[in-house]
Amino acid sequence: MKIVSYNINDSLPWKIEKLLKMGADVLVVPEITCPEDAHLPETLDMKWCGIEYFHHQKKWKGLSIIWKRGQGYITEWFNPKHDYAIPLIANDYLILGIWPTKPTDDRPKKPYPQIAQEIIQEYAPYFKEYKTLVIGDFNCYVNQYDRTKKYGDMLKVNEVLESKGLHSLYHQQTDEEFGKESILTYFHRFHESDSYFRDYAYTNFPVISFCIFPWDKEMSDHTGLEVII
């Protein structure tokens, strides 16, 4: 089973079409438009969530999981209070797509590492029941600007995930230190000189393969991730 995570930056029709041509069984897509505007083929199902952004009166920026119809389902314990986290069961695997994002409404703005850790704690009881993949744009990196003493940065998020039995595929594969990655996944305002590692895939089981796509500047300010299980 092939899982691809790709923050596509702007939800343009040609980008969605390109995603679908990747042949993934499951797509985790931050910054995608709502289902009624995505116009997916009937062979696919899509779950979309997020605080609504409006652009020409349309919801255009949320998190989605897309999967082949009949080959997965959203769990009954999906909790929409976490605006940008979706749990999918596919072939008895738990695929938790996440995109920790600060709400645009009047709620207090939590730091990204806090949002990520709250999502992890919400779904952690199910990590023991399923072979689990947590994947997406974590919006977290080492020494980020909104770190706090309590919630830290990506190092703290990683500590919490490892305490639940999950490990970063990239860091397992490369044995590189967090914050010293040789491949980066996010290019702020499309500048290579201002880049970070903030897209992650964590599992509690061995996978067949993991890779980070080369950066496609036309597609996004992020790179995509591919996991085959």
Where on the chain are the PLM-derived regions?
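Metal-dependent phosphoesterases centered on the DNase I-like endonuclease/exonuclease/phosphatase
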Residues: 114-194, 198
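Structured beta-strand-rich core segments of catalytic domains in phosphoester-bond hydrolases
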Residues: 32-103
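N-terminal, active-site-proximal structural segment of metallo-dependent hydrolase catalytic domains
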Residues: 1-43, 55, 60-63
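Short catalytic/ligand-binding loop motif for oxyanion handling, primarily in non-cytosolic enzymes
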Residues: 12-14, 35-38, 103-106, 141-145, ...
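Active-site-proximal beta-strand elements of phosphoester/diester hydrolases
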Residues: 1-10, 92-105, 135
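Conserved beta strand-loop-helix elements of the APE1-like EEP
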Residues: 58-74, 90, 181, 186-209
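Surface polyanion/phosphate-binding segment centered on an Asp-His-Pro turn
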Residues: 218-229
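Catalytic metal-binding/acid-base residues of hydrolase active sites
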Residues: 7-9, 33, 99-101, 138-141, ...
